[in-house]
Amino acid sequence: MLLLAAGTALRAQTLGGEYRLSRVFPVEGRQGIAADSNYYYVSGSTVLYKYDKQGRLVARNGQPFEGLPLAANHIGDIDVWNGEIYAGIETFEDGKGENIQVAVYDADDLTWKRSIDWEPASGQVEVCGLAVDRDRNMVWMADWVDGRYLYGYDLATGKYVRKVHLRPVPQWQQGIYMAGGQMLISADDGDADLDEPDNLYIADLRDGKSYATVLPFRMMSDFRRAGEIEGLTVDPATDELLVLSNRGSRIVLGVVRGFYQGYDRCWEWSGVSTRGTTANCTKCMSMKR
């Protein structure tokens, strides 16, 4: 899997209203994707990757849990901001999460720097999606097990701030990304066995209320044999919306349990550009041989 990382200050991002698929390419890692002006960052369940915009591997951390304050075995979604990668990390077994934390890594060499503690009293029991709110200096987490709420933490203090009730609740949330106070949510809510597409949703958090209305944003019907879609992000240099997809993989309780006929690998991603009405979509996926 690939995405871009850098430390260049860029303009505030806004979301487009329409996207079309523009390109597809395979990457390593099947969980999260992040981008800055120069690099792509991708998370596998136990590995972090960094690629340049030409798809060349620049850095790899195969031991991302080394030094963490809590034992962990699973990386979920990621985001990148101000030269740091934020990763939702936990111990994940049989569809349940423990030892939740936001681990922060150096975007240059992918080494761990620090972690933000999880607040159990918030009610969060798992972490799937993660997004940095660049306007309010917060980091948000989503919960795959109980997806009713998004959970926000202050980046300056690391303290839990609040949760937002999603109404209605997208089923099997995977990734989140915030732009201009609006939260994009990817959901593995299509039954891949029946060739049902997964979907993207949007929720407006700008009013600061304890709840937010969730609306359909995009049906990912142009993803073939998606298996499940995962993390998503917007490339700040190109305005492309990038969506990770485990094409060809059969997923049961969040774990790959083999492949559909004609496939022998997974791990792909995709993206979508957001400039004007001609916005396009980029998608990275594992291809059948």
Where do the model's predicted regions map?
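Loop/turn-rich, solvent-exposed surfaces of beta-rich toroidal or solenoidal domains
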Residues: 168-205
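Structural motif
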Residues: 48-51, 94-103, 147-152, 192-202, ...
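Repeated scaffold domains used in trafficking and secretory/extracellular systems
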Residues: 27-34, 69-77, 122-132, 169-177, ...
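Surface loop/turn motifs at the tips and blade-to-blade linkers of beta-strand repeat domains
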Residues: 21-27, 62-70, 116-125, 164-169, ...
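Blade-loop segments of beta-propeller domains
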Residues: 57-92
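Short loop/turn segments immediately following the C-termini of beta-strands
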Residues: 45, 90-92, 142-146, 188-191, ...
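Beta-strand-rich domains and repeat architectures in extracellular enzymes and scaffolds
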Residues: 21-46, 74
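Short coil/turn segments that connect the beta-strands within blades of beta-propeller domains
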Residues: 37-38, 82-83, 135-137, 180-182, ...
